[in-house]
Amino acid sequence: MSTVTITDLARENVRNLTPYQSARRLGGNGDVWLNANEYPTVVEFQLTQQTLNRYPECQPKAVIENYAQYAGVKPEQVLVSRGADEGIELLIRAFCEPGKDAILYCPPTYGMYSVSAETIGVECRTVPTLENWQLDLQGISDKLDGVKVVYVCSPNNPTGQLINPQDFRTLLELTRGKAIVVADEAYIEFCPQASLAGWLAEYPHLAILRTLSKAFALAGLRCGFTLANEEVINLLMKVIAPYPLSTPVADIAAQALSPQGIVAMRERVTQIIAEREYLIAALKEISCVEQVFDSETNYILARFKASSAVFKSLWDQGIILRDQNKQPSLSGCLRITVGTREESQRVIDALRAEQV
């Protein structure tokens, strides 16, 4: 009699799944962590809510109202979740029938869209971006049949550029009555003028993902948002966990979204943008750097000579970057988070010493 292993009992798509390679999962023994697009220094908060004997609100009122005011939308258009990553998954769970519907995304881009779909058993379709990393609208149009959710990251991770707003409008017209278009705005605080939040009234099928992990310097909090029209939010509320935010998370999130918290965030953005421009200028003068791409974010994508050797050399010196070689069209590319001036200098000095 054949023995059935525990793995044999698992769903086939889970057995075949490659988990998302997060920065922490990839590890390393660094002291300069520039691989996860985090804010480089600690922002201090004090807990004010001590009612830990009680379950929290499903959608904490102070968090929802503060975020709605910050984003310029109505509270009914906001859903808070465990990071934007949960928002990615909720949209698939609410709109895609496993084994029947598909999602579509445009690589090179963020890796969680495919992981979330594959976990749920939903087909992934890809339409690689054009040479300038803008949308291939004809390619998308050709593949839309059976697609229920389209993910577009803008500014795009890992390339750092904004998607042309006219292309977004064309995509929203192409998908009207057919699919939800999800604009992933995890990095929008670094270029707030480009947000699509003002478009919600025009497009009932638009959803926008946001996070406190980047400019708000709270990656360890795991708090993100979905902005959408009330009909979409109500559907997501059917599939979200009953208590997605713990009481301490809601407490700190509400503080971060207070008027003082918003001012502090904008000061951090100004500082990071100045540091980004310093690092870009320095990288352009280094011999092992072939090309530095423009960025609207808190990270820089650059193409290197012998990028694997450079990546390993810096890794061995405790400087952890993000290797993008496996992404379509990113051969030779490494992504560098903008950190402190001291961290930038460590990177610059290490790269100048490379004999490539």
From Swiss-Prot:
Coiled-coil intervals: none
UniProt-listed PANTHER family: HISTIDINOL-PHOSPHATE AMINOTRANSFERASE, HISTIDINOL-PHOSPHATE AMINOTRANSFERASE-RELATED
Catalytic reactions on record: L-histidinol phosphate + 2-oxoglutarate = 3-(imidazol-4-yl)-2-oxopropyl phosphate + L-glutamate
Residues recorded with modification N6-(pyridoxal phosphate)lysine: 214
UniProtKB keywords: Amino-acid biosynthesis, Aminotransferase, Histidine biosynthesis, Pyridoxal phosphate, Transferase
CDD domains (alphabetical): AAT_like
One Pfam family, short name: Aminotran_1_2
Enzyme superclass (EC): transferase
Subunit structure: Homodimer.
Name by which UniProt lists this protein: Histidinol-phosphate aminotransferase
BP terms from Gene Ontology: L-histidine biosynthetic process
A GO molecular-function annotation: histidinol-phosphate transaminase activity
Pathway the protein contributes to: Amino-acid biosynthesis; L-histidine biosynthesis; L-histidine from 5-phospho-alpha-D-ribose 1-diphosphate: step 7/9
Similarity section: Belongs to the class-II pyridoxal-phosphate-dependent aminotransferase family. Histidinol-phosphate aminotransferase subfamily.
Annotated gene: hisC
